[in-house]
Every structure is written in structure tokens, then in C-alpha cells.
Amino acid sequence: MSSDFTKTNSYSNKLIEHSVHYRTYSNIVDIRTIKAEYLIAMKLMAGRKYKKDLSDIVGILNEQHKQGNPITFEMIDKAVIELYSGWDKIEKDNVDFLKSVLKEENLENLFAEVMQEELESKSTILEINKNYPDLVKPDNINEILEKAKKKKDKK
């Protein structure tokens, strides 16, 4: 694991218990794999609306469904509890998003929609950062995106 990743909020020291060794490169880099529901749990924890966390969740659910291995809320719940000791640290918006995605039948269309929203959010953040360099912080980014969306919807 990269040292940068271990500093993110989606990192859990329990990941090693739920991952499987895949390969070692040059006797230096260990590559490990993890079940899809654990990856979804990590994406929920990160939950960045301006990166690809939410579209990744839709994409993972879609691919697993296509492969005949649909992922249930119960599977994700188990992964969240095992990695993060519960849902307390996951934003309510992300939990609501997951529940709505699990009810969705057309995940391919939803994937495209969510991906577009993420691209727009990223563009919004970059524009705001350009105009107000010190305004955007990790703890206010969702609020900024929400205000920008409301402003755009009024137009």
C-alpha cells in the first residue's frame, strides 16, 4: 500500500485481513486484491463527489451483476462493519446514494449520469479554486458543491 493511501479516510488497518496476495513485483511491491463489496465500502467511506468514487460504486455493482455475482446491501453492510466498525463515519448522502443505486435496474445509464455529475463537480471545484484559492477545504467541499448546484439549478 502506498504511504499516501494509508493517510486517507478510506484506509483501514483491517484491509490486510480481507485482501488476498496477488503478486509481488521486483521483490518490492506487493499487489493485493479485495472483494468487490469491500471496495464499495471503501468508496462509500471516501465518497468524493468530485472524483470517481460514486461512479465506481455504480460500475462495480453493474459489473458484478453482469458476471452473475450481484452484491447485496447485506454484503456491503458486513464489509463496512468489518473495515470501519459500522456506518457512523460514512456520510448519510453516500448511504442514501447506495440504497438508491441498489434499487436501480438500469445501472449502465445511471453510471453515465453519475460520471457526468462527477465531471461537473470537478470542474466546479477547479473553477472555484481558480477564483478563490483558499476557499475549498476537505471539510467544506460538499457544501460548496451543493451551493453551486442550487445556483446552477436556479438559472
Question: Where are the regions a protein language model picked out?
Answer:
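Compositionally biased terminal segments of proteins
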Residues: M1-K155
